[in-house]
Amino acid sequence: MGVFLIIIGQCKPYTRCYIFVPLKIKIMENYKTPEQTKIGHVHLKVSNLDKALSFYRDLLGLEVTQYFGEDAVFLSAGGYHHHIALNTWYSKDAPKASPNTVGLYHVAFLYPTRRDLALIIKRLKDNDYPIIGGTDHGVSEAIYLTDPDGNGVELYWDRPKEQWPRAENGNLMMYNGFLDIEMLLKEI
């Protein structure tokens, strides 16, 4: 077992928290994450909860599943307890993070069909919300935007696995190609 530095402090919304900081990381040999493992949710620090809700709830259509006072909220698609959590515990009225620092690059939302992706793109366009990029990755088609705090957001759909581009040796061959958004909108 590695050596840990234990930091005891005040944490919101909890009264006390223990943070275990590894002083030396011991690598377990031959460990593989179970195949059924998924990323369950992302918890974002935001500067203004109302602006963040306007984006995630009102524009993208996520449903609020629970409020935690005036400082935090859980949102979901499809009845899950939460896919996105938003809080202002340490970030209320904070400036946007510089894009040239470490941290979150983007959160990606997987839509079930190409038509569903087209529908959200139309919604963004109808609301004059800026799309900052679009890419055909071979395995998927994606658009990119930012939330009110500058967090990157990817909206995409996956092609069926049997259509994914592969090399002769079977390796996946993703790429960054042109995405014709107007052609995609013809799905509607």
Model-derived regions, located:
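Vicinal oxygen chelate
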Residues: I7, P13-T33, K38-S47, P95-I188
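Short beta-strand/turn micro-motifs at beta-sheet edges
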Residues: M28-Y31, K92-A97
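Core segments of cupin and vicinal oxygen chelate
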Residues: P34, L44-W89
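Acetyl-CoA-dependent GNAT
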Residues: T88-S91, D158
